[in-house]
Amino acid sequence: MRAAARIEAALARLWWRPQPSLGARLLQPLSWLYRIGAALHRLPYRLGWRAAQRAPVPVIVVGNLVAGGAGKTPTVIALVQALQAAGRRPGVISRGYGRQGSELRAVDPASTAAAVGDEPLLIHRRTGAPVWVGRRRGAAALALCGAHPEVDVIVADDGLQHHALARDLQVVVFDDRGAGNGLLLPAGPLRQPVTRHPPVNTHVLYNAPAATIGWPGATAVRGLRGAVRLRDWWGGAGASPGALHALRGRPVTAAAGMAAPQRFFTMLRSAGLTIEPLPLPDHYGFATPPWPAAARDVLLTEKDAVKLPPDADADADARPRLWVVGLDFRLPDDFVAALLDNLRRVQRPQCR
């Protein structure tokens, strides 16, 4: 195991427990320094010394209070689809974590994950919405509006702790791990403290069967849509439940390059599959195949699939067969209705 992976595993053992352990308490002085640094970062905006940039249209920020994944990207995709179904014309901005370079760039069907980031590419592929990536979110919002004047709401992929771009609404996502031991980084997983009540204009979504902290919120509807061969997925084919069910009773390798891969593995086991789990680092690049040479069938998340070319699975009889597993992640109707109601109160025109 690499040194970084060992450190990550050790921190996870400290973070994801109901109460702080002795090891977490020993790290807590560093958490106090982190809290001071975060407060100093926010101070110029709170005192009016620095003004947050306001986009021409409403901005909805989607993010986590905890380090690592809690289901932010599926939430962004589901939110964009819900806005589209309601007649809105959303666009998406993202930093494009893990990509090469930091320049402003539009995501299009010919983009690669290396150039724009795996999550922005997946969001664009799943929703068809215009997506721009850039280190400075304000500049990305202006570039998006300039290129797509029809956009009437911007969804910011991540950025809860970034204050240079003003937000009108925010969606905070928690998974079944909640706030862990309740401490700030590095003693715990929190990027900012969990207050007694959620901030104003905050909608809370639980990527879990029930609420996992004290904030009121909605629970997402989640499941597996099925599986499709990688080459067919790139061709636009949808995931089939039958293809996934056909893998039952066969030895299958399940690979997942995400912050919480066990969630994917658990869903596959719940679907009746016998899997050999292969957890990978978040944003894993797939420069070389990580699965065993003897593997016959490999299941991948869509986030990982965007980093593999179609010809990685070009031969119908190739070994291993690469399957993309689609996630069915939906927002509750009352959650969408409440968010749309708040969005209607924000009086700003389209980008044009």
Segments and roles (model prediction):
Residues G96-W215:
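Phosphate/Mg2+-binding loops and adjacent switch elements
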Residues M1-A12, A85-R88, L160-R352:
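ATP-dependent carboxylate-amine ligase
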Residues R42-P109, P349:
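Walker A (P-loop) phosphate-binding motif
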Residues L33, T73, I123, D157, ...:
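A residue-level signal for conserved active-site and pocket-lining positions in enzyme catalytic cores
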